[in-house]
Amino acid sequence: DAKEHDYQVKVIVYIRRQDGLANSWLSQQVKEGWNTNATIKWDSFQRKTRKVVFNYYLLLEKIAEVTGRENIIVRIFDRKKFKGKDHTIFSDFLEAIGVDYTDDFKITEEEANRSLTGNSQEILRIVNTVLPDDDKVRTLVRQAAQDCENYKDPQNNFVMFSEEEFNKFMGRYEKWNEAIAKDYLHQEEPLFDMKRKEGERWTPENRFMYEDIVRFFGGVVIRQQR
């Protein structure tokens, strides 16, 4: 169709450092609640990432077979690297397509799909094992889990990878990430900032789990009374 009508197709692809995508992707599976990954434990998932596409280079090459590399615009999904007027995903995307970010653009909801992490993800994962096939019930418990995430203790800021796990996990994709930097971004510097977030590694036995369980089920009861 593009050749027939004499127009050019450009593909914009945002890629995220693989460890961040891992938690975000599993969080989405758990929130959906009905698929085969909705009850998988984090430790099992991060050791064997199943069908998730973390090798971005192979994915880009498949797209390039259709469009050509020159028509693929690779952007890094990292708040520290977003470009444009206010350094958000919105301004970055508009810059990528050559549109000025003016006051005519109204962002109504900046973070509508916040990920579940640690305790809130684990609680919902376990609840998923007994959930009925009822959209209303699934929505209720998902919202309670999101409240659990939103109102958790500020000190409940565990990391999901130990240093050893992080290095092993990211090492799987090192050569492919280097290839993207070279072939698609034409740069020598690394594709991602490889500084790992410091902190205590999350485990289900952490000191905040009890209060998060109470918060979750309290949220379920309150929502049922509305």
Explain the meaning of each model-derived region.
Residues 1-226:
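Anion-recognition interface
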